[in-house]
Amino acid sequence: MNLIIDKGNTVCKVAVADRGELIAHYSFPQVSLREAGSILADHPALDAAIYSSVASVDKTLLSLLTEQLSTVCMVDERVAVPVQVAYDRSRLGSDRIAAVVGAYSLAPEGVPLLVIDLGTAITFEYVSPSGEYMGGNISPGLYTRLKALNHFTSRLPLIQDLEQQEQAFGQTTIEAISIGVLRGVIHEIQGYIEEVKAK
C-alpha cells in the first residue's frame, strides 16, 4: 500500500492507494507530523511512500516516513521514469514529471498526450506518440490571475470564489473578472488541445 504526498505551492495533497485503487485522500495547507502520524496509524498496511515537493523538502516528514515505511521514493531529477525526457531534468519540477508519468501510465500506447495540471500555475506538458516527453509550458493559475488583477490595478477587487456564469460578458466588475478569468483559462486550454490535435 502506498502513501502519495504531493506538496504543491498552495496545498499539500495526500493519498493512500493500493494496487491502483484510491483508498483515501486528504488536503492540507501543509502536512504536520501529527497529521502524517495519524494517516500512518489509520492505514497500518502502508509500506511505501512517494514524495513530490515543488517547494522546500520537509526533511522532518521524510525522516518520519523513512522510519515508518520500508520504501520512500522522492521524485526528483534522479528518479527513473518510463518516458524519454527531452528536457533538462535538473530544471524540471517534480510535480510536472509526476503528472507526465501518471498520464503516460494511464493512456493507451501510441497516442500524443497533453497533460494539463491546474493549480497555482497551469502546466501544459506534451508527450509524443512515441512516448517522449517533449517539454511543456507554464501559465498563471486561476487564483494567481485573480490576485494579479487585484495587486497590479488600483481598483479591481480580489475575488475569492469564482462563480460559473452563463453569459459571455459580464455586466458588473465582479462578473467581468469572473467570466474573463474563467473563459481565458478555458480558451487557453482549448487552444492547446487544438494545437496537439493538429500535430
PLM regions and their residue ranges:
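Short, charged, surface-exposed secondary-structure boundary motifs
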Residues: A36-I39, P82-A86, R145-N150
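Gly/Thr-rich phosphate-binding beta-strand-loop-beta motif of the actin/hexokinase/Hsp70
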Residues: M1-I23, A103, G110-Y133, L149
